Amino acid sequence: MLRGMKVVLTTGNPGKVRELKEGLAPLGWTLLTLADFALRMPKEEGATFLENALLKAAYVAKATGLPALADDSGLEVYALGGEPGVYSARYGGRATDRERNVYLLERMRHLKGEERKARFVAVLVLAYPDGHAEAYEGSVEGVILEAPRGEGGFGYDPLFYVPEAGKTFAEMGLEEKARYSHRGKALRALLEAYKDGPPPREVSKLE
């Protein structure tokens, strides 16, 4: 399990940092953030969540000499061809979560019922300074509401309704959200892999 191992979280998003710290707590790792280092992060130019997560994790691991964990995640609306996808954090060039939510609702105003189905996807990449990297993924199906509900969470959480739970992510606390969320599922996959120590590299490495 490597309790006390220092790992750098490569996101500056406070919501993601909070959920990652909560989810990784059982491992006993010492979690650092980008605020602990003077790094200029590379642009996220990957075409997939995996490419972006690998880019961030590998860069930070090499720059700091420490293992680095990157989270690249986003919302995919089926009727919009997978938008916003890898552009979730900068959708439509909007600057804030609220503006992006409004923009998404505008893009979906003609969609009803089944046409509003969507999913959240999360890819975690844990990269080591020697170049080894591992990926853990999670996804959750849901529906985009026609108006926001709830005060918690971040990003598109107020719009993403989880039928199984009967509420949006923004209506859930951290623990409940982790049970259902894409990030929670990816974190559980990582926890399972590390429950008896680091997984065999020939099994866990990214091809």
From Swiss-Prot:
Cross-referenced InterPro entries = dITP/XTP_pyrophosphatase, ITPase-like_fam, RdgB/HAM1
Q: Paste the cofactor note.
A: Binds 1 Mg(2+) ion per subunit.
Which class of enzymes does this protein belong to?
A: hydrolase
- Gene3D superfamilies given in the database record: 3.90.950.10
UniProt-listed CDD domains: HAM1
Q: Which residues bind substrate?
A: 11-16, 73, 154-157, 177, 182-183
Q: Which GO terms describe its molecular function?
A: dITP diphosphatase activity; ITP diphosphatase activity; metal ion binding; nucleotide binding; ribonucleoside triphosphate phosphatase activity; XTP diphosphatase activity
GO CC entries: cytosol
List of catalytic residues = 72
Q: What is its EC number?
A: 3.6.1.66
Work out whether the entry's keyword set contains Cell membrane. no
Q: Which cofactor does it need?
A: Mg(2+)
Question: Which biological process terms from the Gene Ontology are attached to this UniProt entry?
Answer: nucleotide metabolic process; purine nucleoside triphosphate catabolic process
Query: Which UniProt keyword terms apply here?
Result: Hydrolase, Magnesium, Metal-binding, Nucleotide metabolism, Nucleotide-binding
Reply yes or no: does the keyword ATP-binding apply.
no
The catalysed reaction is: XTP + H2O = XMP + diphosphate + H(+); dITP + H2O = dIMP + diphosphate + H(+); ITP + H2O = IMP + diphosphate + H(+)
**Domain of life assignment:** Bacteria
Amino acids binding Mg(2+): 72
Subunit arrangement? Homodimer.
Q: Name the NCBIfam families on file.
A: RdgB/HAM1 family non-canonical purine NTP pyrophosphatase (TIGR00042)
Provide the function of this protein.
Pyrophosphatase that catalyzes the hydrolysis of nucleoside triphosphates to their monophosphate derivatives, with a high preference for the non-canonical purine nucleotides XTP (xanthosine triphosphate), dITP (deoxyinosine triphosphate) and ITP. Seems to function as a house-cleaning enzyme that removes non-canonical purine nucleotides from the nucleotide pool, thus preventing their incorporation into DNA/RNA and avoiding chromosomal lesions.
Family stated for the protein in its record: Belongs to the HAM1 NTPase family.
What is the designated name of this protein? dITP/XTP pyrophosphatase
